[in-house]
Regions:
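N-terminal ligand-binding/catalytic initiation module
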Residues: 1-133
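Glycine-rich adenosine-cofactor-binding loop
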Residues: 138-144, 148-192
Length: 192
C-alpha cells in the first residue's frame, strides 16, 4: 500500500499566478460563501461550530526564559473551517502576528493556509496566505457594496485604514455603479 501523501506548496508568487489578486472573482467567491453560511453549510471551531479560531496567549511576565513575551498584537491562531456547497473543502489558516516583526523587515502578520481533503484529512496544498487574507478581507465589503449600495453611490468610506483597508476600498469602489468611486473617505489613526 502506498502511504505517500503528496501536496503542493504555493508561494506568494504562485498565489498571484493562481489568481488570488483577481478581486472580482474574490467578491463572487465571498458572495457564494455567505450563501452557504446563511444555509448553515459550514463548520468552524468551538462548541457552537462558529468560533473564529483558537488563539495562544502568553502570561505577563513569561514564567520561562524561552517563552515569548506578551506584547501588543502578538497572536498565534489556528482558524479551522469546513465550507460545503461546490467548495466542499476543509482548511486551516495559521495566523502568526507580532508588531515587532516590522523591525525585522517582515510583515506584522505572517499567514499560511493548509487546504485538506475532506474525507481523509490529508493535506492538498500549503499556501502563503497574506494576500489571500487581504483580498478576502477586501472582498467582504465588496459583497456589501454590490448588494446594498444605492445606484447613484459615488463615495465610499473606510473605517480603520491600513493594509487591509487598501483592498476594501479598492473593491467597494469597483462594486459601486460598476466602476471606481469618485470620492473616498477614511477614518482612523493610520494612513492607508
Amino acid at each position: 500500500m502506498d502511504t505517500a501523501i503528496d501536496f503542493i506548496y504555493l508561494s506568494e508568487p504562485d498565489m498571484i499566478a493562481a489568481g488570488v489578486t483577481d478581486m472580482a472573482a474574490c467578491v463572487d467567491t465571498m458572495q457564494d460563501m455567505f450563501k452557504l453560511l446563511y444555509a448553515g453549510d459550514y463548520r468552524m471551531a468551538g462548541p457552537n461550530s462558529d468560533s473564529h479560531g483558537a488563539m495562544i496567549t502568553f502570561p505577563d511576565p513569561p514564567p520561562f526564559p524561552t517563552m515569548p513575551r506578551n506584547t501588543p498584537d502578538r497572536r498565534l491562531m489556528a482558524m479551522p473551517a469546513y465550507l460545503g456547497g461546490s467548495f466542499g473543502t476543509f482548511g486551516v489558516k495559521w495566523y502568526g502576528s507580532n508588531v515587532e516583526n516590522r523591525e525585522k523587515g517582515l510583515p506584522r502578520s505572517i499567514l499560511m493556509f493548509m487546504l485538506s481533503d475532506v474525507d481523509t484529512g490529508a493535506p492538498l496544498a500549503l499556501m502563503s496566505a497574506n494576500l489571500l487574507s487581504a483580498y478576502r478581507t477586501g472582498a467582504v465589503p465588496g459583497v456589501g457594496a454590490r448588494l446594498l449600495a444605492r445606484p447613484d453611490a459615488r463615495t465610499v468610506g473606510v473605517a480603520g485604514p491600513g493594509v487591509m483597508a487598501r483592498t476594501r476600498r479598492a473593491r467597494c469602489g469597483d462594486e459601486v455603479n460598476d466602476g471606481p468611486f469618485q470620492e473616498g473617505r477614511r477614518a482612523g489613526p493610520h494612513d492607508s
